[in-house]
Structure formats: structure tokens, C-alpha cells
Curated annotation (Swiss-Prot):
Catalysis: reaction(s): carbamoyl phosphate + L-ornithine = L-citrulline + phosphate + H(+)
Species of origin: Methanosarcina barkeri (strain Fusaro / DSM 804)
Function: Reversibly catalyzes the transfer of the carbamoyl group from carbamoyl phosphate (CP) to the N(epsilon) atom of ornithine (ORN) to produce L-citrulline.
Gene: argF
Pfam families listed in its UniProt record: OTCace, OTCace_N
Family, similarity comment: Belongs to the aspartate/ornithine carbamoyltransferase superfamily. OTCase family.
The keyword Mitochondrion is assigned to this record: no
Protein name: Ornithine carbamoyltransferase
Length: 302
């Protein structure tokens, strides 16, 4: 039976641990130059409604490493962008491909793709969640901290799609989660309620120093995401005191790791000093997107 991953909650704690173990193994094999052609003659269709650097390159490289093939399907270049229904697109692509990855504006799009396709569908970013990002993040945390339990994960900034997945993922693996957002930018109540139902321990505050106090992980993201450009001026004012800088790091544990899903707006949500400093694991985190997604593709498509 096919499995889709549209939310981090589509994976159990056990499945997350299995994926991270697989990702670390695949990372070692890649560094050693070992062949991993596990998906020879298999094809992954990649539907993009939003521009991307890390998502596109990492998924394409993943399929190349596996001896398979990836097809970049920009929504402007296929009929889905000219009025063909998502339902018909899903059914058609199911006859050609072995998996679909979709980076979309609306979460409803990936839900429909999953419902009407007979092949696995991966959410590579929607307006609600970004499970692939969190798998790469959790791999990075495991590499640096070797555990999830007894860790405090502090999110500073917008309670956006990545924050939603981080909140829910932390609840699944047993990390304490603290989010600091300006009033009105908190994660939506449905995500907080879901985290609670998963046994999550979390706090929501509008004071970054409260969230970051004794944190093991500090995470930030852009203040103005794709689609929010009309609010740029307003957001830059409201988020001005939510910058991850040296002063804020001083409130966390000395061995805190700093994370960012990228792309970053240096000088806004994070300073150069922190991004390029000794606590930053941001570029290892970016690399781990590749390995974590390889593990996920392999689980769903092998």
C-alpha cells in the first residue's frame, strides 16, 4: 500500500528514527563513494509552484545518486497551470511515475495529489507544513546532540509552515519546544492543539529571551516568506526585536546550535556574526536535506 508524507505527523517516532538512521548511512556511503543505485529505472516527478534552490537540487541529486530519474515540472509548463484539474493530473502522472514531490502554494494541492494518485506523494513545502525540512533538521540535531529527549528547541520569528512542522515534530520525538513570535504571528491554534495531543511540551511567548533561555537549539527563518511580500514593511517593523544575534545567544546554553532553513536575509532575522560563527550548523543542516530526503524517497519508492 502506498504511503504519502504530507505532514511530519504522517511519520511515527519509530519511523522518524528509522529514517534518520537510514539518512546517516546514506550520507556515509555517499562520502565513501559507494554506489547506491537502489531506484534504478524509477522516476520522481517534481511539481513546483514556488521557486527553490535546496529543494530542487537536493531531490534531483537524490534521484541521480539512486540511479533513477527526476523530472522538473514547473506549474507554468504543465497543464495544471492552464486549468487541468489536480485530480486528472494525479491520475495521469500515476501512470508514468513512481513518486510525486510537490512544492506548492496551497496544502490542498498536495492533499488532492495524494488522494487521486496511486503513487507516493511527498510534501516538499506547502503553506501549512514543510516535513522534508524538519527531517533534515532532526538529522542535524541528532548528529550534534545525539538525542532529542531533554533538549530545548527555541524558534524565534514567524510561526510559519516550517515552525508548524518543527512544533509537531518536536512533540513526536519528545523535545521541549519554545516559540517566540510578535503578537499575531504565533502558530495557529490547530497546530498547538495537535502538538498537545501528541504529548508535546511547548511554550508560546512574545519575548525571544524567554524562549531562548537555556535552549539547546535556536532556529530562525525569514520574516517575509514567499507570498507575504505585500506585508514586508509592516513585518520588518514588528519583527525588528526578534533578530538572532550574539546578545540573544548569550541567554542560551554555551553549546547551543543555531539553525536556519535558508534562504537567509543576513542582517535581518540573523546576523553575519551568528550565521558564520562557531554555534552555526546552518550549512550542515542544508546538506542534510539531501540525505534525509534520500532516506524518505527510498522508504516510499523502493
Amino acid at each position: 500500500m502506498k504511503k504519502d508524507v504530507l505532514s511530519i505527523t504522517d511519520l511515527s517516532k519509530e519511523e522518524i528514527y528509522e529514517l534518520l538512521e537510514s539518512a546517516m548511512d546514506l550520507k556515509e556511503k555517499r562520502k565513501a563513494g559507494e554506489p547506491t543505485e537502489y531506484l534504478k529505472n524509477k522516476s520522481l516527478g517534481m511539481i513546483f509552484e514556488k521557486a527553490s534552490t535546496r529543494t530542487r537540487v537536493s531531490f534531483e541529486v537524490a534521484m541521480t545518486d539512486f540511479g533513477g530519474h527526476s523530472l522538473y515540472l514547473n506549474s507554468r509548463d504543465i497543464q495544471i497551470g492552464r486549468g487541468e484539474t489536480i485530480e486528472d493530473t494525479a491520475r495521469t502522472l500515476s501512470g508514468y511515475l513512481h513518486g510525486i514531490m510537490a512544492r506548492v502554494m496551497s496544502h490542498e494541492t498536495v492533499e488532492k495529489l495524494a488522494k487521486y494518485s496511486t503513487i507516493p506523494v511527498i510534501n516538499a513545502l506547502s503553506d501549512r507544513e514543510h516535513p522534508c525540512q524538519i527531517l533534515g533538521d532532526f538529522m542535524t540535531i541528532m548528529e550534534y546532540k545525539d538525542k532529542f529527549e531533554d533538549l530545548k528547541f527555541a524558534w524565534v520569528g514567524d510561526g510559519n509552515n516550517v515552525c508548524n512542522s518543527a512544533l509537531l515534530g518536536s512533540a513526536i520525538v519528545g523535545m521541549e519546544f519554545a516559540v517566540a513570535c510578535p503578537k499575531g504571528y504565533e502558530p495557529k491554534p490547530e497546530f498547538l492543539e495537535k502538538a498537545k495531543s501528541l504529548g508535546g511540551k511547548f511554550t508560546v511567548t512574545d519575548d525571544p529571551k524567554v524562549a531562548v533561555k537555556d535552549a539547546d537549539i535556536i532556529y530562525t527563518d525569514v520574516w517575509v516568506s514567499m507570498g507575504d511580500e505585500a506585508e514586508q514593511e509592516k513585518r520588518l517593523k514588528e519583527f525588528a526585536t526578534f533578530q538572532v544575534n550574539t546578545e540573544l545567544l548569550g541567554v542560551a546554553k554555551p553549546d547551543v546550535i543555531v539553525m536556519h532553513c535558508l534562504p537567509a536575509r543576513r542582517g535581518l532575522e540573523i546576523t553575519d556574526e551568528v550565521m558564520d560563527g562557531p554555534n552555526s550548523v546552518i550549512f550542515e543542516e542544508a546538506e542534510n536535506r539531501l540525505h534525509a530526503q534520500k532516506a524518505l524517497i527510498l522508504k516510499l519508492m523502493k
